[in-house]
Amino acid sequence: MRWGILALGLLAVSGTSSGPDGSFGAVFFPDPAVEILTPAFQKSKGFSSEEEVTQWFDQVSIRFPNASVQRVKLGTTPRGRIMGGFRINGSNPGANPVRIWVQGALHGDEQATPDGVMHLVEMVLSDQELANRVELMVVPIANPDGYARAMRQSASGMDLNRDMMMRQGPENQMIMSVFNEFRPEVALDFHEYRPYRSDFTEIGSRGVTAYFDNMFLGSSNVNIPEVLRAEIAAYVDGAATAAAQWGYRTHAYFVPEDDRGSMRMRLGSASSRSTATNYALHNCVSALIETRGVGQGRSALKRRVHSMAIIGLAFVQKAAADPDHLRAVLDAAHRDPMGPVIELHQPIEQRRYTFIDLAKRDTASFGFATRNYAQMQPRVRRPKPKFYALDKSALTPELIRSGLLVNQETKSLNQKAMAYEVAQRTEGLGANNQRTQKVVCTQVPTTITGDFVIISMDDLPSRLWYELFEPELDNSLVRNGLIECSIGKQLPYYAIYEEIN
């Protein structure tokens, strides 16, 4: 019934304006007085096609003689499309430019994001000094098959932003291969979010719609060292300030969730399945930027694209302004001595959120119980190992295809170690309907012999190894079913707390 009320409300306010926001769209989301030259703005219908995006990048060095653009082929998608990237430098780059990764359209229905990425590139290259201080690796369409059909998922039906950890989708395998080669110091992932949701019909008398232009998703994962989380927060604050100067409204990312039949909010994130956390676990300043847009057609398109670029530019400018500070933070994060947190306490708090009330056609504030990921508190922490050692026989085809352990060496060991013995185990379904195993393990001293894949905590991405090998964590090899287990048995990998013999 509430769906019908929401639909009638939208018709009532729509007037002669286009798009779901109707007549109040121009009030709350007016377009800025700027010129944007990306492909979508050279036509009156639709968004930039993959071909138009590629042509635009091919012509960048003509429009910007100060730019050097190298096309990078990441690979070929299941539907035979080329996944393309572009490595961009200024004409006179410094000796050690800040490496910045930029991507869009990981979800194929978020169709304005490639133009946001292109407009960001325009802004960077328009400032020759800035362009010479950074090196960009740009993947404007990270899900070409989904983008061609304006569908969120990949050709195989996978949500690629729930697959960043296990990398079962070939798209993520290709992305992470180039990502790891590039080794970015800053990583930006541009998304769009849906401002009209079915659960929003339960708020207010006739439902609400989203008020914020952009929402930031950094990471509150406590296995990311605190020094890096604080640096990411500083970048987000600077970007929010830059957006506000243009009248764009920003907020930390929040989304409704069910709590035993009642609605509460989830504020922030900590999941390594998603780029925001996963890229930060690779030891870089990482943020996912959500822009109000899915289901909006071309409504407020200039505002959407420009706000993405302004936010991205703030990240680029801050990194370029003091690269020594950025690198000192990343070095401190890599050397952080804290071991893996395997159990957390997450308190519930009350917070108020601003929406656009469809009955009042004005803003309104509503209170909700909230799971605030920024307030998570470590409850159980294991010591930091020097190495993890995976029995070579456990290196399954799925694990090999993921590329997670592609650069690790194999050694014959006779070594003291701590085994993980399974004390509890339950099964369920996780992201992309994949089977999961939830376990609790105890560590047992043992001596291991044989051939093992060695993962050193001195090697990047060291904090990613926590997420993979600590079995209790939500995105571990065990939780995702890549390592089978049973109660009373030991897992086929070990933590080593001393130098290897």
In which residue ranges do the predicted regions lie?
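Bacterial N-terminal signal peptides
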Residues: 4-12
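Structured catalytic-domain cores with a bias toward divalent-metal coordination
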Residues: 3, 15-501
